[in-house]
Amino acid sequence: MELDLTSIAPELQEELNRNVMFTTLETVKGWVRSNSLWPLTFGLACCAIEMMGTGGARYDLDRFGVIFRASPRQSDVMIVAGTVTKKMAPLLRRLYDQMPEPKWVIAMGSCATAGGPYVRSYSVVKGVDQIVPVDVYIPGCPPNPAALIYGINKLQEKIRYEAKTGKQVTNL
C-alpha cells in the first residue's frame, strides 16, 4: 500500500512537522559520538586531582555523557593531566595506539600542554603534542573542573562540526 502524503489532514500534518525530524546520517553520528565520550584517565600530577573532581556530584560529567574508563580499549578520549616525562612517553603512545578509532586527546594543564614549570628539566616532554596528536588544550596550573568541562564541551562541538562538514578542525 502506497502512502499519499497529500491526503493527510492539516492537524496531522502539523503534528508531523513538530515530531518528525529529517537529518543526515553524518549529523546523527556526530551527535552520538559527541554525547557519549568515554575518556581514559591518564593522570600524572596535580591536574589529575582536578580531573577526579569533575566526576563528583558537584560537577557531574555524567550529564554530558562522559563516563571515565580504565581501559584504553573502551575509551575514545584520552585526557592527559600532568607532567609527562620522557620515560613515560612510550607508555602514553602505547595507550593511545590501543584506543579504537575515532579517538581524541585533551591536554589538561600547563605541564601537559607545554611542560609547565618543569619545562627546563632534561626529563620532561615539552608538551604532549610531541607524542600524540592533541585536539583540545586546557591551560592552567592546575585548571579547575569547570575548565575541563569547558574543554570537553569544545571537543563535543569539534566532533559535531567535523561530522557535519567533513572538515578537520585543528585549532582549539
From Swiss-Prot:
GO terms for biological process: aerobic respiration; electron transport coupled proton transport. It is an enzyme of class 7 (translocase). Signal peptide: none annotated. Keywords: 4Fe-4S, Cell membrane, Iron, Iron-sulfur, Membrane, Metal-binding, NAD, Quinone, Translocase, Transport. It catalyses: a quinone + NADH + 5 H(+)(in) = a quinol + NAD(+) + 4 H(+)(out). Pfam families: Oxidored_q6. [4Fe-4S] cluster binds at C46, C47, C111, C141. GO terms for cellular component: plasma membrane; respiratory chain complex I. Its cofactor is [4Fe-4S] cluster. Gene3D superfamilies: 3.40.50.12280. Its main location: membrane. One of its GO terms (molecular function) is quinone binding. The keyword RNA-binding does not apply. Binds 1 [4Fe-4S] cluster. It comes from the Bacteria. NCBIfam families: nuoB_fam, PRK06411.1. HAMAP family: NDH1_NuoB (MF_01356). Belongs to the complex I 20 kDa subunit family. NDH-1 is composed of 14 different subunits. Subunits NuoB, C, D, E, F, and G constitute the peripheral sector of the complex. This is NADH-quinone oxidoreductase subunit B. The lineage of its organism: Bacteria, Bacillati, Bacillota, Bacilli, Bacillales.
